[in-house]
A protein has these predicted regions:
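Short beta-strand/loop motif that positions the catalytic acidic residue
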Residues: 202, 208-210, 214
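Catalytic active-site module of serine/aspartate enzymes centered on a nucleophile-bearing elbow/loop
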Residues: 233-270
Length: 270
């Protein structure tokens, strides 16, 4: 695997940890935006593939996640998380001036990345969304019906057909295994509405990848968000039998081949 290093910065709500996988002469910068309850350390394989493809890779642990400060999984405003991701992008651009930037967001990270593209699309050469929480998410509606969300942990089997992935997730001390926090659910609802209100992504090359059998963020609900935000340059790849984490699926190399092929098309020709 590619070597990595960590640094911290002062984010909107405290100290945030960032992992970087360096490249001496990158063709592009990739910023990985992780999902709910997890951390950027779960993206080692993805980062390694991207480094070998010519990227300098960066990824923050969001507030309340992984090694970053904050009450666990407590997010009151996702606009703050978008601002933190912008800080990572600016750091990467300072280290690699003039190099194209690609943002890759998974699940809740897809929501954050979509909102980033709406706010700062001029920063980006391409956007990749994996199982994104955009559009209609029935899980959110169900959980918001409770005054206190029930303690219903994510079933590791819903992540991937590879049982090793589920076992590692269940045993990972940096993964949150408790209930959703109500402020986080309310912030998710607010941001879904904000994304719907702010419209399409214009000409930004966008790749949407999704598992057809995703039970956590079902395909049909995300499609409503994709249809509402897609611009003039959308590519979609739906993987039969795939579950929520297509980057950790049994066909992950196929998925990452699709990602790198898409990035090659999106990068400016020298």
């Amino acid at each position: 695997m590619a070597e990595s290093r960590e640094h911290t910065f002062t984010g909107t709500r405290g100290r945030n940890t960032v992992r970087a996988w360096p490249h001496d002469r990158p063709r592009y910068v990739a910023v990985l935006v992780h999902g709910y309850g997890e951390h950027i350390g779960r993206y080692e394989y993805v980062a390694d593939r991207l480094v070998r493809h010519g990227a300098a890779v960066y990824g923050p642990d969001h507030m309340g996640h992984g090694r970053s400060d904050g009450d666990r999984v407590h997010i009151e405003d996702f606009e703050d998380v978008v601002t933190d991701v912008r800080s990572v992008v600016e750091h990467a651009r300072a280290e690699h001036p003039g190099v194209p930037v690609v943002v890759i967001g998974h699940s809740m990270g897809g929501l954050i990345s979509t909102r980033y593209a709406q706010r700062h699309g001029d920063d980006l050469t391409a956007l990749v969304l994996s199982g994104p929480v955009i559009g209609e998410w029935e899980v959110l509606t169900t959980l918001l019906a409770y005054d206190e969300p029930p303690h219903t942990p994510i079933d590791p089997a819903t992540l991937s057909r590879d049982p090793v992935v589920g076992t590692a997730y269940a045993e990972d001390p940096l993964v949150w295994h408790g209930p959703f926090k109500r402020p986080t659910l309310e912030a998710l609802a607010t941001t879904l509405a904000e994304i719907a209100k702010n419209g399409r992504l214009g000409a930004l090359p966008t790749l949407w990848v999704h598992g057809a059998d995703d039970a956590l963020v079902p395909l049909a609900g995300s499609r409503t968000g994709i249809e509402a935000t897609k611009g003039t340059n959308l590519t979609e790849r739906i993987y039969p039998g795939g579950r929520h984490e297509v980057f950790n699926e049994t066909n992950k190399d196929e998925v990452l081949d699709d990602v790198t092929t898409f990035i090659d098309r999106a990068l400016p020709r020298l």
